[in-house]
UniProtKB/Swiss-Prot annotation:
This is NADH-ubiquinone oxidoreductase chain 4. The gene is ND4. Pfam families: Oxidored_q5_N (PF01059), Proton_antipo_M (PF00361). It catalyses: a ubiquinone + NADH + 5 H(+)(in) = a ubiquinol + NAD(+) + 4 H(+)(out). It comes from Ceratitis capitata. Signal peptide: none annotated. It comes from the Eukaryota. InterPro entries: NADH4_N, NADH_UbQ_OxRdtase, ND/Mrp_TM.
Length: 446
């Protein structure tokens, strides 16, 4: 476990050397493949060193973190080209990656909290330092306040646990069962905001719209998964009270998912549309996770990984067209089929993955989640059917409006993609569709 952390710490001086922008990216890819070869597909903690260890859940999410972070560097070519504080940018991405890996590999609840909150700081720097509009300050404040306001109860809850159990180790805490309402609320609220659950999701579209492409990728790809991972961690000792109160969160997230899907249908901003679709997807993840059934837990993990790759890829696409046209508005991003014919294929592939068409990992996750939520209560079928329908509707809206229609009169030339962009999109789409062939890694980890 320490070897990965040390490898990343030793990459940090390379960030500040001239002309080694791609070297950092290559080294991150090397670490990713080292991690794949280590292959911890075990349902208990392995590779334990002090407070860090791996289980299957954290293994998949750490792998996703490495993958997305190395792709962030590929996507942020403009930072390199215009020399926009690129050394600082690389260092920021690396620090974020280190915090994420430490978060996912913590076995101690307090260490988990510490790194969970620390990962907010580099993200904030990304948004404030490399964002596009002046409104990024407002987005940063939203992000910070939503997250920090609810993380204080989490800290108090962790100290309460420590006072009662004399331990903060996940493995030992799972022997206890707590039935305290306030503790339940305190432990769970921070993760609901991070997911984000409907009603506390307002920071997400703001942060996404103002963030640079790398910020959007890391937010959609990993940050939302921290909430899901945290919930999976704390429910090991909150099962009893969870079964009593979870219906509240399931109802909010399913009804919220439908409402957010309707909001999606009237967005004119590409990034905002993709951001709201993330909220809808995480709503169904939250619903499945809260049923606490086998299908629900494995499906939520599968959809988290699938959504991380898919949503990140869509943000890359939105950024590619933004770099060419200088706008994210759907009123200007019209008729892209004429403007960038070769990118239309990628728009199509990632859009259908977003609406959970086979053979994507999202399909597998959504089927498991539908299974778990419907078996939990028959009434949920109503909102689930709406959710599935509108999910397809807004994805088709995104695809059809951007690719078809009359080309905007201000666009005067055609534009091809370059190899870097195809490579980037391929590396989002390929694992997404390949993993369905090795789905036992995602489904049979409990």
């Amino acid at each position: 476990m320490l070897k990965l952390i040390l490898m990343m710490i030793f990459i940090s001086p390379i960030c500040f050397m001239q002309g080694l922008f791609w070297m950092v990216h290559n080294l991150l890819f090397v670490i990713t493949f080292v991690l794949i070869l280590m292959n911890f597909c075990l349902n208990y903690f392995v590779n334990i060193s002090y407070f860090m260890g791996f289980d299957v859940l954290s293994y998949g999410l750490i792998l996703l973190s490495f993958w997305i972070c190395s792709l962030m560097i590929v996507a942020s070519e403009s930072v390199n080209k215009y020399n926009n504080y690129k050394n600082l940018f690389l260092f920021n991405v690396l620090m974020l990656l280190i915090f994420l890996v430490l978060t996912f590999s913590s076995m101690n609840l307090f260490m988990f909290y510490l790194f969970f909150e620390s990962s907010l700081i580099p993200t904030l720097f990304l948004i404030l330092g490399w964002g596009y509009q002046p409104e990024r300050l407002q987005a940063g404040v939203y992000l910070l306040f939503y997250t920090l306001l609810v993380s204080l109860p989490l800290l108090v809850g962790i100290f309460y646990l420590y006072k009662n159990c004399n331990t903060m180790n996940f493995y030992l805490l799972s022997n206890y069962m707590f039935n305290c309402n306030l503790l339940y609320l305190a432990m769970i609220l921070a993760f609901l905001v991070k997911m984000p659950m409907f009603l506390v999701h307002l920071w997400l579209p703001k942060a996404h719209v103002e963030a640079p492409v790398s910020g959007s990728m890391i937010l959609a790809g990993i940050m939302l998964k921290l909430g899901g991972y945290g919930l999976l961690a704390v429910f090991s000792f909150l099962q009893l009270i969870g079964l009593k109160y979870n219906y509240i969160w399931v109802s909010i997230s399913l009804i919220g998912g439908v409402l957010i899907s309707l909001v999606c249908l009237r967005q004119t901003d590409l990034k905002a549309l993709i951001a709201y679709s993330s909220v809808a997807h995480m709503g169904i993840v939250l619903g499945g996770l809260m049923t606490l059934s086998y299908w629900g837990l494995s499906g939520s993990y599968t959809l988290m990984i699938g959504h991380g790759l898919c949503s990140s890829g869509l943000f890359c696409l939105a950024n590619i067209t933004y770099e060419r046209l200088g706008s994210r508005s759907l009123l200007i991003n019209k008729g892209l089929l004429n403007f960038m014919p070769s990118m239309t294929l990628w728009w199509f592939l990632l859009s259908v993955c977003n609406m959970a068409a086979p053979p994507s990992l999202n399909l597998l996750g959504e089927i498991s989640l539908l299974n778990s939520i419907v078996s939990w209560s028959w009434l949920t079928m109503i909102s689930l059917s709406f959710l599935s329908f509108f999910s397809a509707a807004y994805t088709l809206y995104l695809y059809a409006y951007s690719q078809h229609g009359k080309i905007f009169s201000g666009v005067y030339s055609f534009s091809g993609g370059n190899i870097r962009e195809y490579f980037l999109l391929f590396l989002h789409w390929f694992p997404l569709n390949l993993l369905i062939l090795k789905s036992e890694v995602c489904l049979f980890w409990i």
